Amino acid sequence: MTESHSAGTDVLARLAVVLESRKPENGGDPEKSYVARLFRKGDDAILKKIGEEATETVMAAKDARAAGKTGADADKIVYEVADLWFHTMVLLANFGLTPADVVNELARREGLSGIEEKASRKDQG
């Protein structure tokens, strides 16, 4: 594991701990915490935010491409993807899942072609 990869997964793990602490049943206060408020509102509110953030990510990418921006010039994409990842992490936490679960799934798929991976899902029912 590279240092950058390790630091990235550490950030995700720390954020997962914070998200877990924001659940109302763990003392998160919906009056003081945006995340606690999302948890209190439930799946539909979280899913709505994911949809909004996904749309904003798409628009940032389209805008960057139209402007000929790539790399560091396309920082709006990174900003929007961070929002999207954050809200998907809220969803994961709401289902008792963590970023490690997603990383493990990505590791399982590593080295598989997309066609093989899709076929393996059909075999799983």
Curated annotation (Swiss-Prot):
GO molecular function: ATP binding; phosphoribosyl-ATP diphosphatase activity
Keywords: Amino-acid biosynthesis, ATP-binding, Cytoplasm, Histidine biosynthesis, Hydrolase, Nucleotide-binding
Any Gene Ontology CC annotation: cytoplasm
Cleaved signal peptide residues: none
Predominant localisation class: cytoplasm
InterPro entries cross-referenced by the UniProt entry: HisE (IPR008179), PRib-ATP_PPHydrolase-like (IPR021130)
UniProt record, GO biological process: L-histidine biosynthetic process
Any Pfam family hit: PRA-PH
Family that this chain belongs to: Belongs to the PRA-PH family.
Official protein name in the record: Phosphoribosyl-ATP pyrophosphatase
